Structure formats: C-alpha cells, structure tokens
C-alpha cells in the first residue's frame, strides 16, 4: 500500500536495527567483533577506469564471501557462499576509482548476531570511514544483512561462528540504458517514488511519473505514489543476463518521464531501472509490494 506522508518508512532502510548503534564514520574495533583477522578482498568485474570520467556510468558493488560455519557440538560446514550487496552508484555520486580503491584496500571481518529473534550477518570493514560516501559499507564501516537472504543454506537453529576464508569484490557495470536521477536531483533533497522489495534492501527508486498520470487523483500529495501503485501489476522483473544478482524493470514509456534521468536516449525506449537482489528473487511482478518515497542518495536524511 502506498504511503505519501510517512517519511519514516524510508528511515527504516537508512537506520535499520543491526547498525543503528553505530553512527557515521564510527568503525567498531576489531577485537569487539571477532577473534579472526581481517581479510582483504580479491577483485572481479567490469572495471574500466576510463569510466570514472563519465558521469552517466553506474556500477553495482557486491562482496562475495566464502565462510566456514561452526557451532557447538556440530561439525564445521566449510565453503559456504554468502552474497553481500553493497549498492548501486554512479560517478555523479562518487568517483569510481576512489570507491574501488577504498573497497579493495579495506580489511573485512564477518560476524553473526541476533536482533529481535532474527539472525543477521554483519560485515565489518576495518579502518577509516568516508562520512559522505553513498555506499554504507564505506560510509559507516559495517553493514548487516538478514542471514537467510545472503546465505543460501538454512542455519537457523543454532548460534554459529563464522570464519571468513575468501572475499571477492564484484563490480558490475550497468548497461547504458540504466536510469538514474540526474545530478541535480541526486545531490539535492528531492524524493522519488520507490518500490520496497525487501525489509533489508533499499527501495528501488523509480523515475518521476508523468504529470498526466496523477492528474486523475484528487490529492496531489498522494499523486505520484498512487500512480505507481496503480500500475505495479504491469511491472515485470527480468534477470540481467551474465550478471550476478542484478535485475531490471522496464517501465511503461507512457507513464514515466525520462527527461531528468541519466540514461542514453535510444529512440522511444522505456526507462529501465536496475537493482540488486538475491539470485532466487521472484520474477512474477510487484503486486503487494509497498510503495514509498525515497531519496536517490542514501546518505541523505528524511525531513
């Protein structure tokens, strides 16, 4: 259901319980997190440093971990993969080369904790945070994920200890048709309609609905969200070929404005929005998803 006035809805994504106690640029000392030593990631991906000079280039950042899991009176399970999405970012938001360098030179640990009965995996980057960076991992130094979202096996019956054995940074360049808010919208305080797909993933920010689409609605404040809600059943999710955990939505061209977006114009193409989600994310549309207002830049605070 759409909610036009509840700005706090988006705040749950900015400050969810797992890391609410840790403010910007406050990194947790390693000895408070784990006995293991931090590990530095390897690199795979579509990195072309020439792209750092192109403002309309976007990349998706993911940490892919291999962990050993041990529990009391149970055999250690080795080589368990974990998928840890860090977010999608454009060069308008932060220089690509600086982001990749900061991620690759960081040392990481992984721990597990429970909050309100829900098990979480927390990734901790040791070192200095970058307060204004769009990616939470670089801004605050730690990021938490629901365990069953990022680890494909079910380890829900016991408290486990994680030992990080391998870590890879995956950088995937988004195709040229990717829509992102233009620079002035991105660094300003404009909120966009967005679709919430998972409580612990940021909402998917959508382009502005064309004016004629919400003239039908009597309340102008609810207009953009109600217009989105009315067409959720039309949205279809596609897995992006040859990309890991990257999905896209092609939006109806007659409903959405692309003028303020960064996508390269290709005739009458519809806006295409890309987002990160687990590989088993359902492709059966967005019915019953919540529509919210969201900032394109997650470093902004709701007002």
UniProtKB/Swiss-Prot annotation:
SUPFAM superfamilies: EV matrix protein (SSF50012). It is a peripheral membrane protein. Most abundant protein in the virion. Plays an essential role virus particle assembly and budding. Promotes virus assembly and budding by interacting with host proteins of the multivesicular body pathway. The interaction with host E3 ubiquitin ligase SMURF2 facilitates virus budding. The interaction with the nucleocapsid and the plasma membrane may also facilitate virus budding. Specific interactions with membrane-associated GP and VP24 during the budding process may also occur. May play a role in genome replication. This is Matrix protein VP40. GO terms for cellular component: host cell endomembrane system; host cell late endosome membrane; host cell plasma membrane; membrane; virion membrane. Belongs to the filoviridae matrix protein VP40 family. The keyword Cell membrane does not apply. It comes from Lake Victoria marburgvirus (strain Popp-67) (MARV). It is found in: Virion membrane; Host late endosome membrane; Host cell membrane; Host endomembrane system. InterPro entries: EV_matrix (IPR008986), EV_matrix_protein_N (IPR043079), EV_matrix_sf (IPR038057). Keywords: Host cell membrane, Host endosome, Host membrane, Host-virus interaction, Inhibition of host innate immune response by virus, Inhibition of host interferon signaling pathway by virus, Inhibition of host JAK1 by virus, Interferon antiviral system evasion, Membrane, Viral budding, Viral budding via the host ESCRT complexes, Viral immunoevasion, Viral matrix protein, Viral release from host cell, Virion. Late-budding domains (L domains) are short sequence motifs essential for viral particle budding. They recruit proteins of the host ESCRT machinery (Endosomal Sorting Complex Required for Transport) or ESCRT-associated proteins. VP40 contains one L domain: a PPXY motif which potentially interacts with the WW domain 3 of NEDD4 E3 ubiquitin ligase and the three WW domains of SMURF2 E3 ubiquitin ligase.
């Amino acid at each position: 259901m759409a909610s036009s006035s509840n700005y706090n809805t988006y705040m749950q994504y900015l400050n969810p319980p797992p890391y609410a106690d840790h403010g910007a640029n406050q990194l947790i000392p390693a000895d408070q997190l784990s006995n293991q030593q931090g590990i530095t990631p390897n690199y795979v991906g579509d990195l072309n440093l020439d792209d750092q000079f192109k403002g309309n280039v976007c990349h998706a950042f993911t940490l892919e971990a291999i962990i050993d899991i041990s529990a009391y009176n149970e055999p250690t399970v080795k080589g368990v993969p974990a998928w840890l999405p860090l977010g999608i970012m454009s060069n308008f938001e932060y220089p690509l080369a600086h982001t990749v360098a900061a991620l690759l030179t960081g040392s990481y640990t992984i721990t597990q904790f429970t909050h309100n009965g829900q098990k979480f995996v927390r990734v901790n980057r040791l070192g200095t945070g970058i307060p204004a960076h769009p990616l939470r991992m670089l801004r605050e130094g730690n990021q938490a994920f629901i365990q069953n979202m990022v680890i494909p096996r079910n380890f829900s019956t016991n408290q486990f200890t994680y030992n990080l054995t391998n870590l890879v940074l995956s950088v995937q360049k988004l195709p040229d048709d990717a829509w992102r808010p233009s620079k002035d919208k991105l660094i300003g305080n404009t909120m966009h309609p967005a679709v919430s797909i998972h409580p612990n993933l940021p909402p998917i920010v959508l382009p502005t609905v064309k004016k004629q689409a919400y003239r039908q609605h009597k309340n102008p404040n609810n207009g953009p969200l109600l217009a989105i809600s009315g067409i959720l059943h039309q949205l279809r999710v596609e897995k992006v070929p040859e990309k890991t955990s990257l999905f896209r939505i092609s939006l109806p061209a007659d409903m959405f404005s692309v003028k303020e977006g960064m996508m390269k114009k290709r005739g009458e193409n519809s806006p295409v929005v890309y987002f990160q989600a687990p590989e088993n994310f359902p492709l059966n549309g967005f019915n019953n998803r919540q529509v919210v207002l969201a900032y394109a830049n997650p470093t902004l605070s709701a007002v």
